[in-house]
């Protein structure tokens, strides 16, 4: 989940430094990391250069990883994670290409696997701490399909139509699917310019309230099961939306719940920071350095600060989906 990834920083060089302060060193912060005739480089020198916030972020990441792994290791199947990674490797054209992509991001395959495990632990934490009733799940989700006719943002764009032609085409398709709603998937596969959903008969799966842009969402949640919308305009183009029959609701319920929890946390980061605080209290986490404690409480565990970061990162616009959860 994106929000949690913003909070949990990667454990990189600073983690190695913190390791030097631990089992392989004495309690003094003046441990020598590198010696030379010109002078030594000590742990204290590097920590001063790095800054308290970076050290706090990395320290918190390490301790949280340990605590989450201890609490939820029996609830996360690493075989499922391995299967997911195999699928991703295939999508990238093989293991070598996938590892090359990770290397460009400063990660090894083992690092990536650990990150996915941490994400799975975080999801378990939120399932424990964030309440979502069956009624909420029903009221805030709809199984959805759509057909998209894209509008060119500029004349040189290879994909899409002019606004006028896109609207005319969408209106023509809308009349066709309104007459033959059972052929929606067939028509979506042929006409939709959203290639990823067109391959699945236009299916977007279960859409959660707050996940899509307002105009799309308002039209969708007015529909009864099996109904088709009028033409809906978004920044992407013109959509025809269908509320699909939810024959698989019970089997998909846990996935829908997870999506809804993520959407809740995206809107209210305090749910996540409170969950972290409860977990840290349960495991008697004790900050030995007052400055590090303050840095963690003022940034990582401050929901207002997280909200500010979210707003800064979302200023560039987000297309059809609002949060990208």
UniProtKB/Swiss-Prot annotation:
It is found in: Cell membrane. Residues 159-200, 303-325 are annotated as: Disordered. Its EC number is 5.2.1.8. This is Foldase protein PrsA. It catalyses: [protein]-peptidylproline (omega=180) = [protein]-peptidylproline (omega=0). Plays a major role in protein secretion by helping the post-translocational extracellular folding of several secreted proteins. Belongs to the PrsA family. The keyword rRNA-binding does not apply. PROSITE patterns: PPIC_PPIASE_2 (PS50198), PROKAR_LIPOPROTEIN (PS51257). InterPro entries: Foldase_PrsA, PPIase_dom_sf, PPIase_PpiC, PrsA_foldase, Trigger_fact/SurA_dom_sf. Keywords: Cell membrane, Isomerase, Lipoprotein, Membrane, Palmitate, Rotamase, Signal. GO terms for molecular function: peptidyl-prolyl cis-trans isomerase activity. A lipid is attached at residue 21 (N-palmitoyl cysteine). PANTHER family: FOLDASE PROTEIN PRSA, PEPTIDYLPROLYL ISOMERASE. A lipid is attached at residue 21 (S-diacylglycerol cysteine). Residues 139-245 form the PpiC domain.
